[in-house]
Amino acid sequence: MSNLLRVAVSKQKRRYQKNGYDLDLAYITDNIVAMGFPSEKVEGVFRNPMKDVQRFLDQYHKDHFKVYNLCSERVYDHSKFYGRVGYYPFDDHNAPQFEMIDAFCRDVDAWMKEDSKNIAVIHCKAGKGRTGLMICCWLMYCGMWKNTEDSLRFYAALRTYNQKGVTIPSQIRYVGYFGRSIRESIKYVPRNVTLKKIVLRPLPKEINLSEVQFNISVGKNCVFNSKEHNMNVVISKKKKTVVDKNKKDPKKKLTKENSEKNIDSQQQQQSQSSLSQSQQGQSSPNMQSLSASGTISSGSNVGTVNGNTLHQLGGSQFSLSDLADGNTIGNDEYISFEIGALSLAGDIRIEFTNKQDDRMFMFWVNTSFVQQLEIIPKSGLDKAHKDKNHKAFPEDFHVELTFDQLDQQQSHTTVVASAEEQTNNQHYPQSSNNVATSSSHHDNITVVASDAPQNNNNNNNLNSSNSNNATTTTTKNNISLASSQSNPVQQESNPSTTTQVSEENSAPKVEAEKIENSNASANDSETSSNSSS
C-alpha cells in the first residue's frame, strides 16, 4: 500500500524501483541526482523514507555524496547525512534570490572537485520544480549545456516521463537569467530601478475590475500594497455598439434573444447617461460597481487629469472617459495603475489578487535583467499560464511594467573569465557519453545514457562503450528515448559506466521508454517576455 501511495504522489516523475528500493529519485548525470524530500514518520509512507534514502546512498555512494536541501518550509538534522548537507532554501512555486543560484553552483563545483567519485543529491519537497531550477543552472554553469531551453528540456526528459520538469514561469525565467549571465560573463550586481506604472492588457475576465489589487515585494518583504496607497487607476474599455435587429423587420416576432438585446441596448444607454452625470459631479443609481457593464461605484468627483474626470474609489482614483466616448486605440482595453515612483532593486515579486485576496497571478523579475518597458505574456505569469481555455484571461493577456530611464552601466558588470575560472569550466568536458552536447540551438541533441549499473568507484568514467546504451534524441519539439531494452515500467535515467559490478552494490539500470508528443517543451526564459532584456 505504501508503495502505491508513493507512486501516486510522485505522479509522472521517474522513480528508482529496483534492488528492493522504491524511491522518487533519478540520475540526471553521473554525479547529479534529483529526488523528493527524505521524510520520516507518517510522511515517509507516501514520500521518500529517510531510512531508505540513507541506505541507498550508503550502498552506492558511501562517503561520496552531499545532499542539498532547497526547502524553506522544512529541514532535518544534518547528521542524518554525516553533516554533508548544503542548505539553499526558497519557497515552493517561487524563484530564489538570484545570488543564491551562483552560491549553490559554486558549492556543488567545490564538492565535485574534491573527488571524482563525489555526487550531489538535490531535493526540494517534490524534487521537481525548485530542484530542476538549480540543476538546470548547474548544467550551464559546468558547461554541459550553453542554452537555457536545451538545459530545461534535458532535465525534463531525465526527471519525468511526460517531460514536464520546471513548469513555473518565474522559475523558468530565472534559469534564463542565469544562463544569460553565464554566456555573457556577467558579474551580477543588483540594479536600482524606479517602477512607474503597471498595465494589464487586455482586461482580465470574470472579475470586478474595481476589486483588482496587487502587492509588490523585494524578496519576502512587501514594499507596496495597492490597498494602502493612493494612485490613479485608468480603465480603457471598448464602446459597445448594439444593433436592434427588430427595427430592420417590423414583422419579426419578439423572441427572448431579441428581447435581451433590447435590454442590453437600454442598459448601454443608461450606462452612458450615468457616466455623463458623473462627469457633471452628480451621483447615479446605476453607478454600483466597476464591472464589465462599464459602471463604477458611486464616489466623489476628485478633479480631472488630461481632461478626464477622476472618481475616488477606496484609496485609488479611476478615469472613465474612455468608457463614455469609446476613445480607445483600436480595440484596446486595459487597466493601468499609476504607481508614481517606486524604487526597487534585486528580486521582485508582484502578485495580483481580488478583493478576497485570492490570487489571480504573480511573477518574479530581477531588476538587473529588465528593460524600460518590460512585457510579460500570459505564458510568463504564474497561475495565469494554466488558463489554457482563456476563461479568466484573454489569450493575448500580458503585463506591462514601465520603469524610469534605466542606467545600463549599472545593470551589470561584464568581466572576462580568469584563467582559473576557464580551467574550472574545463573540469567538466563539453562532449562525453554522460553529458548532452549541442552544436546549435536548433540542432538535434543526442544524449547517451547506458543501462549499465552505476558504481561509486566509476561514476565519472567518461569513456564507456557499454553495448546496452540508451540513446535520447532531443529535437525542438520532441524528446524520445530508444534502447534495446523494452520494459518501460522501471525506466531510470542513470548515466553510463563501464565497470561490471553485482546488482547488490549497483545503482539502477536504465531501461528505455519511447516518449512521444512532448507538450512540455519549456520556453527559453530569454524570450519569456515579449522583449528580450
Swiss-Prot record:
Keywords attached to this entry: Cell cycle, Cell membrane, Chemotaxis, Cytoplasm, Hydrolase, Lipid metabolism, Lipid-binding, Membrane, Protein phosphatase
Its EC number(s): 3.1.3.16, 3.1.3.48, 3.1.3.67, 3.1.3.-
Catalytic activity from the UniProt record: a 1,2-diacyl-sn-glycero-3-phospho-(1D-myo-inositol-3,4,5-trisphosphate) + H2O = a 1,2-diacyl-sn-glycero-3-phospho-(1D-myo-inositol-4,5-bisphosphate) + phosphate; O-phospho-L-seryl-[protein] + H2O = L-seryl-[protein] + phosphate; O-phospho-L-threonyl-[protein] + H2O = L-threonyl-[protein] + phosphate; O-phospho-L-tyrosyl-[protein] + H2O = L-tyrosyl-[protein] + phosphate
Composition bias, Low complexity: 265-298, 455-478, 517-533
Record's subcellular location: Cell membrane; Cytoplasm; Cytoplasm, Cell cortex
Entry GO MF terms: inositol-1,3,4,5,6-pentakisphosphate 3-phosphatase activity; inositol-1,3,4,5-tetrakisphosphate 3-phosphatase activity; phosphatidylinositol-3,4,5-trisphosphate 3-phosphatase activity; phosphatidylinositol-3,4,5-trisphosphate 5-phosphatase activity; phosphatidylinositol-3,4-bisphosphate 3-phosphatase activity; phosphatidylinositol-3,5-bisphosphate binding; phosphatidylinositol-4,5-bisphosphate binding; protein serine/threonine phosphatase activity
Membrane topology, as annotated: Peripheral membrane protein
Domain Phosphatase tensin-type span(s) in chain numbering: 14-185
GO cellular component: cell cortex of cell tip; cell projection; cell trailing edge; cell trailing edge membrane; cleavage furrow; cytosol; equatorial cell cortex; nucleus
Homology family: Belongs to the PTEN phosphatase protein family.
Protein name from the UniProt record: Phosphatidylinositol 3,4,5-trisphosphate 3-phosphatase and dual-specificity protein phosphatase PTEN
Organism expressing this protein natively: Dictyostelium discoideum (Social amoeba)
Lineage of origin: Eukaryota, Amoebozoa, Evosea, Eumycetozoa, Dictyostelia
The gene coding this protein: pteN
